[in-house]
Amino acid sequence: MHDLIMSMAEVDISLDIGTKAVRLARAAASSYLRNEKLPDPPADPIFQEKHGVFTTINTYPGNTLRGCIGFPEPYYPLGEGIIRSSIYAATEDPRFEPMKIDEISHVTFEVSILTQPVEITVNPEDRPKAVHIGRDGLIAVYNGASGLLLPQVATEYRMNPEEFLEALCEKAGLWEGCWKYKKVKISKFQATVFGEKDPEGVVEKR
């Protein structure tokens, strides 16, 4: 059977699917931290389609980042990608200590399902005009270094396109204004985002 890789335009991601995605992320991290059998993905066909995906874990209350890891490219079927990214966000984000099981009821889970990244091919000085705040996430790649910012980052910190691009350069460990250079590859993607309002609570589309 051929691999299924579909663009977001071809898939209507409902709140029901988003809720299942977030529940799967929480169940995967919880099971891993308890040394229990990992959950199986839901049976819905979309969980067998390949998508880029990120899992973000935030503290509750407080809403501060606790972990965020994922796959910008559609390497895995969505269900497997959610399971992997959730476990990695909980235990392997180098910015934080690995989560302990007693934290699981004090964090919220958010899942971002990504479209295929597309390179921004305009002249570098025009890149800000190609970035739509609130819709686009960004990826920078140069000489083995890379960085990614999800669309919600720009919204949360009220960035304009130039500020978002500067933050991307910093995230990638590159120099200030790196986005102004053609040798730095900048790509954009969109994400459909679902997250818990509170731990194990109602899931909303963001």
Curated annotation (Swiss-Prot):
Pfam families: AMMECR1
Coiled coil location: none
Highest taxon of source: Archaea
Residue ranges constituting the AMMECR1 domain according to the UniProt record: 16-205
InterPro entries per the UniProt record, alphabetical: AMMECR1 (IPR023473), AMMECR1_dom_sf (IPR036071), AMMECR1_domain (IPR002733), AMMECR1_N (IPR027485), AmmeMemoSam_A (IPR027623), Uncharacterised_MJ0810 (IPR023472)
NCBIfam families tied to this protein: AmmeMemoSam_A, TIGR00296 family protein
Protein name listed in UniProt: Protein Ta0236
Originating species: Thermoplasma acidophilum (strain ATCC 25905 / DSM 1728 / JCM 9062 / NBRC 15155 / AMRC-C165)
